[in-house]
Amino acid sequence: MLEIDNQTPLESDFLLLEKIANVLAPTQIIELILVSGETMREINRDLRGCDYATDVLSFPLEAIPHTPLGSVVINAPLAQTNALKLGHRLEEEIALLFIHGVLHLLGYDHEKDKGEQRQKESELIKIFNLPLSLIERTQDSF
């Protein structure tokens, strides 16, 4: 189940995100929060000590029955900018960020694992017919 807190003027169809949530965590609640760039910078600074606006952050919650799996926070204006720059729809960019964030909630960590998160993202991208994943874009830019 997906709970959405859209704190931006951005209007989007979240049906795809609900489908993704149902595939990744069919029995759990996932909170999606769409924020401005400034709000994302504040969250990143206050909680991670990084004074810049990033595209997506994940905050897992304790594994308590009937409580949310955690929160995925997406920088909506940056998602919009990246979608335009990369030539795909905003909904696709948000879906890519959402997948990336939810996988972190589920315990995947692309900085430490041996490619498991990248592999899972690739599988989901194929299932939902999405463009290049966040990890693949980052690795391809080096």
Curated annotation (Swiss-Prot):
What is the top-level taxon of the source organism? Bacteria
Transferase as a keyword of this entry, yes or no, is no
What Pfam families does the record point to? YbeY
Q: Where is the signal peptide?
A: none
**Which cellular component terms (GO) are annotated to the entry?**
cytoplasm
Q: Name one GO biological process term.
A: rRNA processing
Q: For this protein, what does the record note about how its cofactor is bound?
A: Binds 1 zinc ion.
Under which EC number(s) is this enzyme classified?
Answer: 3.1.-.-
InterPro entries recorded: MetalPrtase_cat_dom_sf_prd (IPR023091), YbeY (IPR002036), YbeY_CS (IPR020549)
Its localization reads: Cytoplasm
List cofactor names only: Zn(2+)
- Cite a single GO MF annotation: RNA endonuclease activity
Task: List the keywords (alphabetical).
Answer: Cytoplasm, Endonuclease, Hydrolase, Metal-binding, Nuclease, Ribosome biogenesis, rRNA processing, Zinc
Q: Could you say which residues bind Zn(2+) here?
A: 100, 104, 110
Per the similarity annotation, which family is this? Belongs to the endoribonuclease YbeY family.
What this chain does, per the entry, is described as: Single strand-specific metallo-endoribonuclease involved in late-stage 70S ribosome quality control and in maturation of the 3' terminus of the 16S rRNA.
Report the PANTHER family cross-referenced here.
Answer: ENDORIBONUCLEASE YBEY, CHLOROPLASTIC
Q: What is this protein called?
A: Endoribonuclease YbeY
Q: What species does this protein belong to? A: Helicobacter pylori (strain G27)
